[in-house]
Amino acid sequence: MSEHYYTKSPRSESDRRRFEAVLLGRRLTFETDAGVFSKSGVDFGSRLLIETADIPDGARVLDVGCGYGPIGLAIAAARPSARVTMLDINERAVGLARANAERNGIRNVTILASDGLEAVRGQTFDAVLTNPPIRAGKAVVHRIFEEAHGALAPGGVLWVVIQKKQGAPSAAAKLEELFGAEHVRMAARDKGYHILRAERANNC
């Protein structure tokens, strides 16, 4: 069994590879490695999240579990006025994301190693995006949801991609518990993947 990507310091032997992907109309080059999520290319769920999330110009954006960077870097490249912060517990992934930002000339990003949202405690964001580490277990995923709710500015939105078979209904239930059912909806659905949108109310 391959090493779990939700690991602070992967021990798997390096196996670097490089590929190009067109995201939000921009061609980006990514380098990936063993021990990170979806090392062979941008996964379908992340692509769907990137295409669905409605990120306004100038937004403060947080990408939780950024991996080698496709979600956060695609948004940063498409929204030069946005300020994008990217987090991952996996130090190898963080190094790759930083190198990929440099490789693509993307400057409006800050990329940090972090267990959950620990590294940005006290900061607030207009949008949080996550393709959560399902293999790490429900407790980890729900903690990300809880911390994201706390980090959103009033009116801010959490965007989540999750497969139905990997727990989309229970994820939606948790989001409704945190945000209120009236503030949670399915923004997109394709090939078994659900994009959940949860908006923090102005009065909470």
For each predicted feature, which ranges?
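A short glycine-rich, Lys/Arg-flanked "PGG" loop and its adjoining helix->strand segment in the class I
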Residues: H142-P154
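Class I S-adenosylmethionine-dependent transferase superfamily signal
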Residues: I75, E147-H149, L175
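Core SAM-dependent methyltransferase catalytic element
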Residues: A188-C204
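Conserved beta-strand signature within the Rossmann-like core of class I S-adenosyl-L-methionine
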Residues: G155-I162
